[in-house]
Amino acid sequence: MPRPDWAPLPRPGCVNVDGKVLLVREGLALAMLRFEPEATIDEHSAPYEVDVICLEGEGFISVEDRVNSFAAGQWMTWPADRVHRLWTADHGMITMMVERL
């Protein structure tokens, strides 16, 4: 079975973030993101809910004006059509993204 490879996120505003898509099915996509220290995904929104699970490391997560620390074992749901962001400071982080398309 082929294994997906890590690749830089092609989205403008993403700095030092690699991703790999694990699964895409009707209504569902699973991906992992790997953040280096000082990495960021700029503020953006999506027309669907996204569950974000921190698997390893630590960083920060926001929804609109709410900013929270984000560390291994924590999760948050980004509501549809709300501005959100993920980033790191001194440490790296790996997240699982569960997109309900």
Protein language model annotation of sequence segments:
Residues 1-31:
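A short, N-terminal "cap"/entry segment at the start of jelly-roll beta-barrel domains
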Residues 26, 62-66, 89:
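Short strand-coil-strand connectors
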Residues 29-46, 80-81:
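Conserved short histidine dyad/triad with adjacent acidic residue
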Residues 34-36, 46-61:
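Short, conserved beta-strand element in jelly-roll/cupin
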Residues 65-80:
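Short acidic-glycine-tyrosine-enriched beta hairpin
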Residues 80-101:
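Ligand-binding loop in jelly-roll beta-barrel domains
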